A protein has these predicted regions:
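Bacterial signal peptide processing site
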Residues: 4-8
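A cross-kingdom feature marking solvent-exposed beta-strand/loop segments within repeated
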Residues: 10-39, 109-111, 146-148, 152
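Alpha-helix initiation/capping motif
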Residues: 16-19, 92, 141
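Long, charged/polar, surface-exposed segments that mediate recognition or autoinhibition
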Residues: 66-111
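A short, surface-exposed beta-strand/turn
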Residues: 58-77, 134-152
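Low-complexity, compositionally biased segments
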Residues: 10, 93-95, 120
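Exposed beta-strand-loop-beta-strand "reactive/processing" segments of non-cytosolic proteins
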Residues: 26-61, 114-140
Length: 152
């Protein structure tokens, strides 16, 4: 995935993480409340949502672009794994990226993902790119506290 850098290092309204909740709300407005998601990932360009269907054996990808939910992509069959609901999404969009940006000031935050875990819990992952080309996935708590770092 190619991400765009941003001069805006604040979170909240000026950051792409602020698009996640409206994107989920748009899917729920389109399909009904209580949808289950395999993953939601936002970057500077779009927010991608993978909605679980057919008893979580398939996923329907949606793109939220410029404040609008786009028509769904074709269903992806053979999906499996954990899912989560909108109620499980509890990150603080004002602070969730700040610890990573403070620890890696020269790196670009390329994406923020919400991934499903066992029991409907979620895992938040910040994907970064260093000026030297190294990539890290940084798992964070809802407030941005760094929990784990995985080099890619």
């Amino acid at each position: 995935m190619v991400g765009c850098g941003s001069d805006d290092h604040g979170a909240g309204g000026g950051s792409f993480v602020a698009d996640i909740r409206p994107a989920i709300e748009a899917v729920e407005a389109e399909l009904g409340e209580g949808q289950q998601y395999f993953e939601v990932t936002a970057n500077e360009l779009v927010t991608n949502l993978f909605v679980a269907v057919d008893d979580a054996t398939a996923a329907v990808p949606y793109v939220y672009l410029d404040g609008e939910l786009q028509p769904p992509a074709p269903k992806l069959t053979g999906a499996s794994g954990f899912t989560f609901s909108a109620d499980a999404v509890d990150f603080d969009e004002e602070t969730v990226l700040e610890p990573v940006r403070e620890e890696l000031p020269d790196s670009t935050v390329e994406a923020f993902s919400i991934e499903a875990g066992a029991g409907g819990v979620v895992r938040y992952v910040v994907s970064t790119l260093s000026p030297e080309g190294g990539r890290l996935d940084v798992t964070v708590a809802a407030d941005g506290t760094v929990l784990e770092v995985d080099p890619l």
